[in-house]
């Protein structure tokens, strides 16, 4: 496209406000706009905000996946869904946040054919996370409301449900990914009287698909999650009224902790995505000028994308096993004290904990026997010998104290 022709066209259409009919090849891709160059401080601030978000999400979700995968005690249905959500959030941080923040700041697509991939991973992983939360809430609801019945999400059923979720999410995202393409735009800067060329990654607006996506990713989950948590709350209230708090068993307390953790996850998701959906539902971009609108959308977009970073933090504070795993991974930080022995004899290794408990119990028994023997044979000399027995699984020495008369 001839640069001089575009500048002349911009002067007539933008500065002189003449009612011009644009050439067919420029229809919809030529715009008048003030200078969109950002100050260095603004660019650095936005870059730091999004890089920190990406780093937190990538590291946090990677650690969650490692904890679940590496430790056998974590291999059950509920945690399979947590692993699935962590993987989905990792994809969002890598393929969506990693490319979209520069596009939203500079209004220029730098990544070529990754447009299709970014469009897909902007929708599919979010749908996976939402559907996983709905499945978990239903599972928790059944466990609380019908505690004597068999758990609906066994290991096998959990894997099947996760596969179905990915199929549904892929089908949901495909229309947007297929329609996405990279197009050129020409912008006339009314301040500098220059024309710049930029590339946009976008898909034609389809109201039907937009409404379907809103229903799947936000409206339907709120209805389902709201109903399941209401039933859970009613069931817990009935249980509390019928049972003295001192008589609650560990199983009931574990259920309560899992429900609270899931509730925090749902609240974080709803709060983070609410401004984003309000912005698009009510077309709030029309209420801002070009400069303020960009910053408003960047803030709203950052809040929405930050939902992929909060779940690992919630797990760490709400679950002892995740907390131990995180402490062990970050033990190199001076303020975190987690020795290898503390990690290996923690709730992540229940077999070792039982072995240690048995050893300590034997030690206490032999110690009491020794005290009794000393009292009975105070006039005799005793020889105390340290014997060692080998654990048949790990061959770790367990020392037992025994005594005999000399």
From Swiss-Prot:
Q: Name one Pfam family in it.
A: 7tm_1
One cellular component GO annotation, for this chain's record? plasma membrane
Membrane topology (Cytoplasmic): 69-76, 137-158, 226-261, 319-406
Record field: transmembrane: 48-68, 77-97, 116-136, 159-179, 205-225, 262-282, 298-318
Subcellular location per UniProt equals: Cell membrane
InterPro entries found in the cross-reference section: GPCR_Rhodpsn, GPCR_Rhodpsn_7TM, Neurokn_rcpt
Keywords from the UniProt entry? Cell membrane, G-protein coupled receptor, Membrane, Receptor, Transducer, Transmembrane, Transmembrane helix
As for membrane topology, the entry says:
Multi-pass membrane protein
List the GO molecular function terms: tachykinin receptor activity
User: Which residue pairs form cystines in this protein?
Assistant: none
| Protein family | Belongs to the G-protein coupled receptor 1 family.
**What biological function has been recorded for the protein in this entry?**
Not known. Putative receptor.
Q: What is this protein called?
A: Probable G-protein coupled receptor tkr-1
Provide the species name.
Caenorhabditis elegans
Q: What is the lineage of its organism?
A: Eukaryota, Metazoa, Ecdysozoa, Nematoda, Chromadorea
Whichever gene encodes this chain, its name is tkr-1
